[in-house]
Every structure is written in structure tokens, then in C-alpha cells.
Amino acid sequence: EWDKVIGTLSKEHTVYTIDLLGCGKSDKPAITYTCYLYVQLLTDFIRDIIGEKTDIVATGASASFVTAACQNIADQIDHIILVCPESIHALAKAPNHKSKLLAKIINIPIYGTFIYNVGARNTALSDSAECKYLYASILGHYTTVNVAHCLEGLTTSIAVITGKNAPETSQKADEYCHILPSIEHLEVPGSGLLPQRENANAFLEQIDLLLSDNC
């Protein structure tokens, strides 16, 4: 996801790319993954590993973890850049009886694994059967948080980058700007849901502009 921009960013910044628990090359224990878990992991990583003021660039549903973490350690976060974040409405969904039942069904060894293989096909969670526990947690709304509440009162510099060829991402960005008018919204031409891959040069120009006051 970030392979086309890491090299350039690393020339002027120390770059950490994190595979959160249950994702990518990280461990994938058979647990219920929650927003609180990811907030704690992110908070601990910034405090214990990075150990200095940090800029965060996150995509999609990770917006919930980042904004929630910022409430805990706002003094250690300089900039937040959200790339095509999930809508605030979608991230506000809380676990209910139906979603909890769905999560339990997916966690069933055989039948649940079949549902996972069909439902997660062609997604970032399709590379391993072990990912089904995170998939179940997402569908169960365990990984969501009230982002609108998290944004209120934040003074951290926040920007949203979207792809110009995906107008729905611009609409989602407007939700964030409506909650916190200080949020800056930038569009990357010639790109859709993954501007950092689809037009890496233009994406890097926007990142450089947003982080230029750090240099």
C-alpha cells in the first residue's frame, strides 16, 4: 500500500510502517479486535518506540484509531493525515445483537471460515484464514468509534487526502470538515481509493506541502 512512497518520504523523514495486530505480517490471534486495542497499540508505539513528536498518515477505517489515540497523546502528535478515510457515519456504528451474532458465526471453525472466504475475497483481509477473526470483529462493529466525538476539541493539525476519481471519498471528507472546520481537504488527480499508489508523485507533493513546516 505504501511501497511507492516510502523511499521518497524516508529521504527527509524517519518512516515507520506498522502492521497492526491481526493485519499483514503481524500476529493474528483468535481474539475480538477492538478500537480500544488498536488505540493502545498505537499509543504505546508512539510513546515507547518512536519517543518523539510524530506525524501520522493513515488510510480508511484506521481513521478511528488515529483520532481516538490523539485524544490520549495529543501532545505527541504533530500532524494527522487521513487518506480516503471511512465515513464518520460508518465508523460510529456500535456493536448490536445482529452484528455480534454475525461475528460469532464467522468465528465458527468450518461454516464461519467459508463465509469469511466468500465475504473477504479480493479485500486486504483475504490473504490468510487467520484474518477471519479481524474480519469478524470489523463486521461486528467492534473496531469502530465515534470519530465525531474524538474530533471535537482537537487542536492537532489534521488533513484529509482523497482521490479525485472517487467522488464518494470527497463526500466522506466533507463529513470530517463539517465536524472540525480547521481540517484541510486535498485531492490527488488521476487517482481513486489509493492515491498513494495510483498517483504517487502527486500524493507526495501533497504530503510534502502538509509537512513542510516540520523541515
Enumerate the predicted regions with their spans.
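Active-site loop/oxyanion-hole signature of alpha/beta-hydrolase fold enzymes
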Residues: 3, 7, 16-57, 205
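Flexible "cap/lid" loop of the alpha/beta hydrolase fold
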Residues: 67-72, 77-109
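Structural signature of beta-strand start/N-cap positions in the alpha/beta core
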Residues: 14, 53-55, 77-79, 184
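Catalytic active-site module of serine/aspartate enzymes centered on a nucleophile-bearing elbow/loop
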Residues: 183-215
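Conserved loop-alpha-helix segment in the C-terminal half of the alpha/beta-hydrolase fold
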Residues: 7, 158-191, 197
